[in-house]
Amino acid sequence: MPTNSQDTTVLHALFGGTFDPIHYGHLRPVEALAAEAGLNRVTLLPNHVPPHRPQPEANAQQRLKMVELAIAGNPLFAVDDRELHRTTPSYTIETLEAIRKERGAALPLAFIIGQDSLLTLHKWHRWQSLLDTCHLLVLARPGYNDRMDTPELQQWLEQHQVTDAALLSRQPQGYIYLADTPQLEISATEIRQRRHQGLNCDDLLPRSVQRYIELQGLYR
């Protein structure tokens, strides 16, 4: 997209995940984050081959379809399927650099992660380049420590952390914002296990996604 078509006062956010399946533990905290940080659009990025996790049970097209069903009619969300076309592992920094190049150097850009991911961020591929490309918006997660593993990592966090979300739209990248979002005890692993056991998942994910899972015979 041409750089001159972008509003450089609006923060654009991206949220990656395997989404195997997508559920309310993904959607509800991001909706709360959007209200807290003034986001008007969050683009979901389904992973193809996550480098640090087991292979998904659902295939790429099934996971994309579940994301599309989950966000249908919700103007906050969009989906970008670029990672599903990769044949190599999906490294976050490579995707972010490609999006930054497309959208221009001046656009405020943020990547949403969970608190659990923040604590292991130093194990990610080229993790120290992330803040050269975007801001990090961190969702609260139940049961996780709020401090980094080492004094050096904690210092890195404190050097980049801001508590005023308004600052995120004033520069293109470089900040970390720890959001006060709902901590939902929902995981895709739990949903898959419940499906394997024939248990009800009504309160865990949108009904449209449930219907698709049932029609496709997923997670049996």
UniProtKB/Swiss-Prot annotation:
Q: Which pathway features in its UniProt record?
A: Cofactor biosynthesis; NAD(+) biosynthesis; deamido-NAD(+) from nicotinate D-ribonucleotide: step 1/1
Q: Which GO terms describe its molecular function?
A: ATP binding; nicotinate-nucleotide adenylyltransferase activity
Reaction catalysis annotation: nicotinate beta-D-ribonucleotide + ATP + H(+) = deamido-NAD(+) + diphosphate
Cite the EC number.
2.7.7.18
Annotated SUPFAM superfamilies:
Nucleotidylyl transferase (SSF52374)
Q: Which GO terms describe its biological process?
A: NAD biosynthetic process
Top-level taxon of origin: Bacteria
Q: What class of enzyme is it?
A: transferase
Keywords carried by this UniProt record: ATP-binding, NAD, Nucleotide-binding, Nucleotidyltransferase, Pyridine nucleotide biosynthesis, Transferase
Annotated S-S bridges: none
Describe the function of this protein.
Catalyzes the reversible adenylation of nicotinate mononucleotide (NaMN) to nicotinic acid adenine dinucleotide (NaAD).
The similarity annotation says:
Belongs to the NadD family.
Descriptive protein name: Probable nicotinate-nucleotide adenylyltransferase
Q: Which organism is it from?
A: Serratia proteamaculans (strain 568)
**Gene name, please?**
nadD
